[in-house]
Amino acid sequence: MTRARFTHRAGEYTLRVTGHADFHSGSDIVCAAASTLVCTLAATLDALDADVTELRLQPGDAAVAALSGPGVRTAFLMACTGFQQLADAYPENVQFT
């Protein structure tokens, strides 16, 4: 199961993603979608020159955190919307809180 958790505290946005979706061995489209969302968030924050406070992109263990700034909220909202859609479509494989 992939678990994605979003938090916003004291002007810092954080998205942590752990685990594997285990949708289909060898061609896991759910894991691929989750990876795409996290990597796109990281790339967007880089393009925004955001103040990134944590960046970890490892298989089964990712974290992206940034201080509030222009475009940062929107970038995290995009990623969170994607994870909510994944969780709705694949509830046995993705959990989003």
Question: What name fits each language-model region?
Answer:
Residues 30-34:
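Short, conserved glycine- and acidic-residue-centered signature motifs
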Residues 1-27, 39-97:
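N-terminal intrinsically disordered, cationic/polar leader segments
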